[in-house]
A protein has these predicted regions:
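C-terminal motif of bacterial Sec signal peptides marking the signal peptidase cleavage site
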Residues: 14-15
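Sec-dependent N-terminal signal peptides
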Residues: 6-8
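Positively charged n-region of N-terminal signal peptides that target proteins for export
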Residues: 1-4
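Glycan-processing catalytic domains of CAZymes
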Residues: 21-341
């Protein structure tokens, strides 16, 4: 028994040492990135500044999250590159990524085929990411069996996992492109289909929402875990990790980190009258969503506290949305507009 106890102690010690090394490396990468930013500013090279700030924010979330949490980015796949090559310092920070409207849903037009130029550019980012082993989940906005057949053929070539959503608001139920299965899904690379449901307003309350989710067989749930401010319980989330058919699956919570949302529990009434200094403007395409200075410490604390709630209900990880908000600031900088911190 003593031998087994000693062996277990050594295994746990090695595991803790490994995790500490990862944490220390993330901290080093953050410091290194900040030094690089200062150098770029002094030399007038501003192309990477706002991308690097988003990368650092994601690193901080990874460093602060519970062990084994999955982190998936939504769009913004330029983050995985530097100078035209994969950014080896950032690439391992996340576990998967998504891309909206790769094939259908171009410029927020439902059923519209994405222009070849846009599609080819997105593929130039996604193909290297996938070949390097990171799962890629493609979100298309269209309908029709012919489109489903097309996506199946494309996925066979690329290794992506695509779905066809019936609307942009991600509030409707749909059948997956690949059929359901009863396999145990223990990591993102095993996922063959997923449910993206970010707006559960069609359900009467959190319990009806939970009952629906519980009775599905999707491999992966990418969901909003609350309804009208009421969150799923830890027990409910744990039940959702089993498909209706008995197979295990993964439950990921939506988390927007580049925009503030006035319908979230963290939103304070006074912000509607006077914005905090870290809110820049309202997103013209999505009412109630506000572009933020995501590098601001106050905003980071807002996200940290909100993420604490998500941790407490036991989700398997986070779908980090609006990571591509760096585009807004980068464009401002390129046009000669100074952005105060």
């Amino acid at each position: 028994m003593k031998k087994y106890g000693l062996l277990l102690f050594l295994i746990l010690s090695i595991s803790c040492f490994s995790e500490n090394k990862k944490s220390q490396q993330l901290q080093k990468d953050i410091v290194k990135s900040k030094i690089t930013e200062e150098k770029n500013i002094s030399e007038g090279n501003t192309n990477e500044i706002y991308k690097d700030r988003m990368k650092n924010f994601i690193r901080e979330i990874r460093n602060d999250a519970e062990k084994n949490k999955y982190i998936i980015t939504q769009n913004g796949n330029e983050l995985y590159f530097r100078d035209g090559k994969l950014d080896r310092n950032f690439f391992p920070v996340t576990d998967g990524t998504t891309q909206e409207s790769l094939y259908y849903g171009d410029v927020l037009k439902y059923n519209a085929v994405t222009k070849k130029e846009s599609k080819d550019y997105m593929l130039s980012l996604l193909n290297p990411v996938r070949k390097e082993g990171k799962p890629v989940f493609v979100i298309n906005y269209a309908k029709g069996n012919e489109k489903k057949d097309f996506l199946l053929k494309e996925d066979a070539k690329t290794g992506f996992v695509s779905e066809l959503l019936p609307e942009f608001e991600a509030r409707a139920i749909y059948n997956p492109i690949q059929g359901f299965n009863s396999e145990n899904i223990t990591n993102l690379k095993q996922v063959k289909n997923y449910l993206l449901l970010l707006n559960p307003e069609k359900f009467s309350d959190i319990n009806q929402y939970f009952e629906y989710l519980k009775n599905t067989d999707f491999d992966l749930l990418l969901i909003e875990p609350s309804h009208n401010g009421v969150f799923l319980t830890k027990s409910q989330v744990e039940q959702l990790k089993t498909k209706k058919n008995g197979g295990k699956r993964i439950v990921i919570s939506y988390l927007s980190i580049g925009e503030a949302e006035d319908y979230r529990g963290y939103w304070k009434k006074e912000w509607s009258k006077k914005w905090p200094k870290w809110i820049v403007k309202e997103n013209p395409d999505w009412k109630g969503n506000y572009i933020v200075k995501y590098w601001n410490s106050e905003w980071k604390n807002v996200i940290k506290e909100y993420r604490g709630k998500l941790e407490s209900i036991g989700v398997d990880g986070y779908l980090l949305d609006t990571v591509d908000s760096y585009y807004y600031f980068q464009e401002k900088m390129e046009n000669g507009n100074k952005i105060p911190d």
